[in-house]
Every structure is written in structure tokens, then in C-alpha cells.
Amino acid sequence: MTHLIFCSTSIDCGGAESLLLNLVKELDNKYKIIIIYIIGKGTYKSELKSTGAEVFKLNPISLFRTIKLLYKNPDTILQGWMYHGNLLATFLYLLTLGRGKLFWTVHHSAENYVHESLKHFLILKFTALLSRLPKAIVFVSEFIKKEHISYGYKNNHMQVIYNGIDTSLFKRNEEAAKKLIYSLNIPSEAVIMGTVGRNHPVKDYRTFFRSSSLLIKKHPNLHILVAGRDVNLSQFSNELRDLTSEQLNRIHLLGERKDIPEILSLIDIFVLTSISESFSISLIEALAAGCCCVSTNIIFYTHLFPEALTVFPPYDYQSLVKCVEKYIYMSKEQRNKIGKEAILKVEKYFSISKTTNDYKNLWSSV
């Protein structure tokens, strides 16, 4: 049995974290899996443990146990996950004098990361200095790989492995959708536009709500659905100031949710307004659920979904309105037909089984 240690920045709700969860679920019992996370409340802890993995938050005891394991099993795979996770994995590797096979995975856009704070810029430059140490570095897109090379990353084995999802989880669940629609008091004939994601400047919720305001005034059958941490209407009062109370009642804020497949089952048009994304797992999940999607033109896989994915320039809320209306004016049957074609493409290119096989091949070949 091969010991596999994931060192992750966190295991809370997020794209990189959900990929880790899906990857661990998919790996076979050839691997004895241990997950160490640095920050957060550990949202996915119970789900990860249910797979048989051991899960620890970083502390002196878990650190000592991991060091002891590396000394005892020097062929352990040491897989970093996100910047801080990569640093932790490297720290363990150096502390044990090179024991373990060190790998990194980079999930974020460097350009976006360095502009968040000086601390993030320093972390990026520091990881660039250490980037020769891993046996290989995985990036989630070719664009992210090129970005990090421009910031000084150097390694003989830099590979792109796309994020994958368990496509079976996102099959449309009409029964669950009906229950949610009923609980939210949304008419069955409504067109539902929605998004999923925490409130963060990169997500650009201002553009989302600017366009929502225009759309909801123009289309009385439109309802807006938002599932994400720290999103509340008071933060966007300027964008929504012209709406009546009836129109505001058609905006539904659900907060942070774990039942994303069920929520996507009732969304007709999924919108991504992010100004920077390394991959956007939420968009792939929406496509896997058969949603028609509108996104900023920063996504590298738009060519795979010519009908189901329409793009607009970042910040351009008026273009976003036109893109959404393209799908509003379609019949439900037309949207469903487009959605079914998108599902087949996701299954072909972005399944978790393909991602898992790519990682297993990497760990065994380098």
C-alpha cells in the first residue's frame, strides 16, 4: 500500500477543496490517504473521513505524526494542494531531509493572487524559488502554467491536469428542484438565473447585480438565485436601488450551501462574472447539470461549448444582459437540448475519473 499525504491550505467549500474531495473519493484502496489542512473550519472533514482517509488540522501533534511516517516510509507521496499547502509539503520534505516524493498542484491565477496583498506576492515569489524541489508541478490550465513560468517557476516536469468532477452527482434532479422551487415560493413557469460562489472582489458580484437589476425589471418571469458565503443585498444597494419590493423579492440569497447539485437542477441560466479564474469548477458543474451558461471571456474551454456557453468582457454588465436574454428568449425545450449536448462534453473532457487517472500516472511515472 502506498502512503499518500495531501497538504492542503484548507478543506472548506471552494473549487480546489471540492476537487480534493472528489479525487480522494475516486482513488482506490491502493493508497493509504492522510490529509493535513492548515486553516478553516474543515467543512469537508467528515466526508473525507468517510472515505477512510485520516484528516488532521495542522498542529504540533499532526506535524510530529507526519514526520514520523515520512521517516518510516520514505517513498510516501507528498502532494501539496494550493500555495500554502505546497509550502507545507515542501517544509515536511526539507525537514525530513528529502524523504517522500514531493509534488505540487497550483490552482490559482498568479496575476489575481499577487494583486490581493503584498503577503500573497511574497508567497508567490518564495514558491518560485522553491519550485525546482518538487518532482513535478501540476497546473489546472495551460494559461496558469504560463503565468507561473513568467513569475519564475522552474521545474523539469510541469504538467497540466484539468479539474474533474463526479458528473453523476450533477444529473438533473427534477424532484429536488420542485421542492426547492416550492420552498422559495418561485412559480413553476419562472426562468431562473443563478450563480454559485463566495463574495470576493474577484467574483465581481457588482456586475452580476447590475445586470440582474436590468433583467429583473424587464422580465417579470425572471427569478435570481445566489448560493454563496457572505452575499447580502445591503452590500449592493447602489446596484439594486431602482427595484421595487416585488422585484427584490425575486432575488433569492441562499448563503453557503452544500447541496449545489440540487440548486443547479433548478437553474436555467448560470452566470459567472469573475474577472479572473484559473479554471472555474462551478462553471463546469453548471454545464454538467445541463444549464445554459454565460461567463466572462477568461475561460479557456469556451470553444468546447459553442451553444451552451456564451461569453462577455469582464465588467460589461450590458453585454451580460444581452447574453442572458439570448437564453431567456429560448423555449425550455431549446435550453434543454443545448444542456444535454453540454453534459456529453463535460463527461468527455472533465470527469473526475480522467483527472484521477492523470494524477495516478504522474505519481507512478516521475
Q: Where are each of the predicted segments found?
A:
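N-terminal strand-loop element at the rim of the active site
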Residues: 6-61, 144, 151, 232
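A conserved mid-protein helix/loop that constitutes part of the nucleotide-sugar donor-binding site
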Residues: 14-25, 191, 195-214, 318
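Short hydrophobic beta-strand element within catalytic cores of glycosyltransferases
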Residues: 37, 292-295
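Short, structured helix-loop element that forms part of the nucleotide-activated donor/catalytic region
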Residues: 41-49, 225-249
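Short His-centered aromatic/hydrophobic patch
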Residues: 80-88, 106
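A short, active-site helix/loop in glycosyltransferases that binds the activated sugar's phosphate group
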Residues: 133-158, 165-169
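Aromatic "clamp/platform" in nucleotide-sugar-dependent glycosyltransferases that forms part
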Residues: 256, 275
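Conserved acidic donor-binding segment of nucleotide-sugar-dependent glycosyltransferases
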Residues: 309-318, 327-332
